[in-house]
Amino acid sequence: MHCFLGREILSFFCLTVRKMWLKFILAILLLHAAAGKEPEPQYVLMVPAVLQSDSPSQVCLQFFNLNQTISVRVVLEYDTINTTIFEKNTTTSNGLQCLNFMIPPVTSVSLAFISFTAKGTTFDLKERRSVMIWNMESFVFVQTDKPIYKPGQSVMFRVVALDFNFKPVQEMYPLIAVQDPQNNRIFQWQNVTSEINIVQIEFPLTEEPILGNYKIIVTKKSGERTSHSFLVEEYVLPKFDVTVTAPGSLTVMDSELTVKICAVYTYGQPVEGKVQLSVCRDFDSYGRCKKSPVCQSFTKDLDTDGCLSHILSSKVFELNRIGYKRNLDVKAIVTEKEQVCNLTATQSISITQVMSSLQFENVDHHYRRGIPYFGQIKLVDKDNSPISNKVIQLFVNNKNTHNFTTDINGIAPFSIDTSKIFDPELSLKALYKTSDQCHSEGWIEPSYPDASLSVQRLYSWTSSFVRIEPLWKDMSCGQKRMITVYYILNTEGYEHINIVNFYYVGMAKGKIVLTGEIKVNIQADQNGTFMIPLVVNEKMAPALRLLVYMLHPAKELVADSVRFSIEKCFKNKVQLQFSEKQMLTTSNVSLVIEAAANSFCAVRAVDKSMLLLKSETELSAETIYNLHPIQDLQGYIFNGLNLEDDPQDPCVSSDDIFHKGLYYRPLTSGLGPDVYQFLRDMGMKFFTNSKIRQPTVCTRETVRPPSYFLNAGFTASTHHVKLSAEVAREERGKRHILETIREFFPETWIWDIILINSTGKASVSYTIPDTITEWKASAFCVEELAGFGMSVPATLTAFQPFFVDLTLPYSIIHGEDFLVRANVFNYLNHCIKINVLLLESLDYQAKLISPEDDGCVCAKIRKSYVWNIFPKGTGDVLFSITAETNDDEACEEEALRNIRIDYRDTQIRALLVEPEGIRREETQNFLICMKDDVISQDVAIDLPTNVVEGSPRPSFSVVGDIMGTAIQNVHQLLQMPFGNGEQNMVLFAPNIYVLDYLDKTRQLSEDVKSKTIGYLVSGYQKQLSYKHPDGSYSTFGIRDKEGNTWLTAFVYKSFAEASRFIYIDDNVQAQTLIWLATKQKTDGCFQSTGILVNNAMKGGVENELSLSAYITIALLEAGHSMSHTVIRNAFYCLETASEKNITDIYTQALVAYAFCLAGKAEICESFLRELQKSAKEVDGSKYWEQNQRSAPEKSHLLDHVQSTDVEITSYVLLALLYKPNRSQEDLTKASAIVQWIIRQQNSYGGFASMQDTVVALQALAAYGAATYNSVTQNVIKINSKNTFEKVFTVNNENRLLLQQTPLPQVPGKYSLTVNGTGCVLIQTALRYNIHLPEGAFGFSLSVQTSNASCPRDQPGKFDIVLISSYTGKRSSSNMVIIDVKMLSGFVPVKSSLDQLIDDHTVMQVEYKKNHVLLYLGNILQKRRKEVTFSVEQDFVVTHPKPAPVQIYDYYETEEYAVAEYMSLCRGVVEEMG
């Protein structure tokens, strides 16, 4: 060896030789030293790196070559406390021994240490390593009955807590809350627990909630939170599902593509209809350059199987051309035959230049010299589909080793003999085809990428290796497998040893779950294989890390570890199935559940359509396991804590090490291709004095383990119920009729908790709903010992092989006729003779148009029947249609002569027939109070002019309580829209007064309480949708620029009063109060902000005094004391103003009530005296009015007092009732006021508008509580000269019952007699329609129609153009409503309504009961307002009548205008009739 050159000949030796000699000499010296003393034994101590707090764990210990008595001690050091885990004397090597020990409880993530000592006569072994103690809390999951809800539906959900062994925990949840999309808390339940370990809760959604994602938040005692989201949207369940099947990708060389569209009903039958298909490729657009996409489109009928397959040429799309987007967009629109309903499905097809791809699979990243290296190469196409029978070239270190051919799965297995490979690294490359290196500008060339893999040689000091053969597929629970282990051992130290012990240890979820020992005879050969038997169980899920090791006499630990994926399973085995796979709707089916005895099983079954509408992350084994904080512990970094210990072995120089014929390069970091890496991957700490690491370089640059706590970095793999194609045939000569009447269509069918008996089985019978669909059921179960378990989904197809479907519009106008269509579906596998009958009725005349007679319907076909319907009267009209099979032989099918089953299906639907014109109402109210007396009175009901014939509906009612009518109608006090933040409060606030009044008078029943609280809950949810982020409220919420001071105060005080009955978020209230306080000026008065579209709410006066009085009242009614800073300053404002002359009556009434409510007697009395001067009296009653109207100013459409007058009068009444030292004389004065207020009530207990209803009911409730008499006994009789007589009895038991009767004639004169004691509230109501009146008051309105499209074979469509302006006496109107009644058979196009909001043309749009309601803000005097939207026909009405349009001031309804419009498609429709 030439180790010197030139002038360096003076060196004694070159550096390499010198180092070799030094190492040799050192080895000789060490050998002599070792001969002088007994060799120390080898040991292995194993403990999980993460110990789970307050639970048992395991430690495993082994000694090898032990030949003297030693004292062994293992200690857990934590928080200055040492806990002895293991302490004993031992003299022999007894193999691997494991024992349990208890981990102390901790409150947080804690660092601890395990110390090991072993003392003998000639040696003293010590090691100390870090571990982590993890505070393992229970984890919580939430399940809702559905993933999506409609407004007004109830949400049902469950909460379950499990420990880390998946056993149920009886948690007490301090708080379970529901948040809306704006993070407002709308429901909460405190200190919730359940003895069965399943909490089940239900709550309602308001009819008009905030749409979007809601959260259920569950808080545990520790403060840890779990959340679950669900969606609230307006939706219609899809009747069928549309799927597009197309290749996921195309290559630039593909010449065609096949697209298949299928439409299938949810009950599994094909859809009959047509499909519009378009396939498009877009250009890449740069700057302002926009090009239309290249498309192929067509429309075709679906085949009888509901599918359509079509082959398209790809030539037009120029797949290999640059300048286009690299995808095709497929869109399919399927429309049912003779229906408007359609569904759309889309798919994107990517375009790739990659013709094929190679990938190495099932390979190891290390090779062990002497053990064959196995692997697979997979060849796939652009869709990842296998390419078979192709030759793959494999290069090892850039040399072609062999050619391999792919099998039918596209896989080519390979093996490499490593016995003669010495390289520290192998470079593997797989090649299929070589890509063409020729490129043309503007064109995309195909490519065939190769695959590369780098494999490192595993380090072993003795060149001994163990390799566990991996399994690349998940193992299922209960499965028995034999695991193959390869080994090769260096013969050094085995001269006299024939049997070698191999040990194996399994880790899962951070615990030792498996240990064992295999004895192998190595006498014949030091390399070979052995098998480890493995029985998979739930303890090993979701991943088992298996370590196989042996202790080599040359003081090396030879090992390998591998990760096996295990099916996510549970100890509690749950099975769920329906007794049948298919059954008729409305029949009974059994749901059979099997689980561990005494389990409680939570079952859910939902309509498959729900899951089509919104796919959800179903509760599954996957989702439950994902909640476990330690699914698969790998490595030494957990939850930000680094548990890496310093290497025990001394470092070496940076020169390559030559040992046993191999060169090794020392590591420059602590991690390398060695056994330590396998041990580390187990997530276990290993204490050993055997070699496990590749040597590490001694340099300052050596990468040391980071500090224990990390701010970032990778973490250790943790994650926090008899149906077939036909019904079975009965014996010959016996005929059965299977009849169904369908009316129950839920979305969630089953939501139950079922107890499993001691046999481990339960069977529950359910009635299948009427929905023809597939039901998906699932169950999870909990039991204290068996723990948690869950079933795979079970399905039931609820189906009718024969049924009829009737389609009706929502309503029509009296005098119109329309076409009704019934479709009869036959899903039997043979033709049948049918009879279809529309039940005769006195309410309509029906004329069959087609077909001319009944006939046969063949298999998988439907038949349509059409009648022309002529309604005779008004009101709800019921249509009952029955379809039945009859006389099968008439269809000339010989094989069916012996069938003895008939089918009959009936469907009942209702249609509203409305009178023409506009609905109106007049009432007469009488509050009669007496004591043992008789009162008689004549009552006349006159008929107004311009009444639509047949529309008047007079009635008479009586109730024994001043609040009785309002209590019965608290949800419908006004027959007006409620689509904004002001109007919603009329649905909310009166419930508070009703509850408070009934509570004070001890009349509150559970039924009334439940109903009114339900309304409060709903109103609370809805009102939050009008809240701004700063805590204020406005009419249309965030659509308004800022919150409104007046409305915010109203909401604040109402929520405060409601908090006695329902949950109100304190944080919401606190934020609102802060906002109100910021609006107070230095003089104590409040500034007005925001636009309030109700001038009446402000008494028509734009001044800060009325606002300040109102806010002061609100804060006092909210429960704040006079010492509150805001209130104290507010009264400074009011007292200063009271020293001046306040002339406005509305402001006087407000200020009077404020001072009376605050107990300021002198000022209160002063204002009441002043108000008395302006009081009006009529028929013994007293009231106040804002401005006296002259006769010409009064509306021809309505005849009631101004709502402001009711409001003022009510405030005066409240002032009287709350004045300090109230006297009997005050109550007498109050009774006269009450008489006048009562006379203004409508038939539902409300008044003319919003604020007058709220304040008047508050005042009436206060008066009723102050004058309540518990004794009521009255007999009321009403009669007429035409033999009509009706007698009512009112007593203490039924005083809140609203008793009603229709009156026989109008116009008419009636006599009324009241006899007894107590008060009764009597009312006559006349509801009627009027023809559109001429003229207008306050508004102008015109309606135009345009852009009509009226084809014969498709639904008609046109635009409605509304042009209006305000012409009243004020500078602007209040909020305006335009009520557009839909023409019979037409519906609005939703997208056009949405556009009105998006363009800020209107503030709100509602579509209810065939009316489009458009909300406009204040309209300025004579300012033109134009609104346009589209309507389309969804039903054929053959002789349609005009539809009315009304515009009116919501708060001053006497200001109005009316108009009407007709369909531009009328001529075409009338020809069809």
Swiss-Prot record:
Transmembrane domains' residue ranges: none
Signal peptide: 1-36
The protein's name in its UniProt record: Ovostatin
Similarity comment: Belongs to the protease inhibitor I39 (alpha-2-macroglobulin) family.
PANTHER family per UniProt: MACROGLOBULIN / COMPLEMENT, OVOSTATIN
Function comment: Is able to inhibit all four classes of proteinases by a unique 'trapping' mechanism. This protein has a peptide stretch, called the 'bait region' which contains specific cleavage sites for different proteinases. When a proteinase cleaves the bait region, a conformational change is induced in the protein which traps the proteinase. The entrapped enzyme remains active against low molecular weight substrates (activity against high molecular weight substrates is greatly reduced).
Quaternary assembly: Homotetramer, which consists of two pairs of disulfide-linked chains.
Cellular localisation: Secreted
Molecular function terms, GO-annotated: serine-type endopeptidase inhibitor activity
Organism: Gallus gallus (Chicken)
Gene3D superfamilies xrefs: 1.50.10.20, 2.20.130.20, 2.60.120.1540, 2.60.40.1930, 2.60.40.1940, Alpha-macroglobulin, receptor-binding domain, Immunoglobulins
PTM comment, free text: Lacks the thioester bond found in other members of this family.
Sugar attachment sites: 67, 82, 89, 191, 342, 403, 527, 588, 757, 1141, 1221, 1315, 1347
Cellular component terms per the entry's GO annotation: extracellular space
Sorted UniProt keywords: Bait region, Disulfide bond, Glycoprotein, Protease inhibitor, Secreted, Serine protease inhibitor, Signal
Main location: secreted
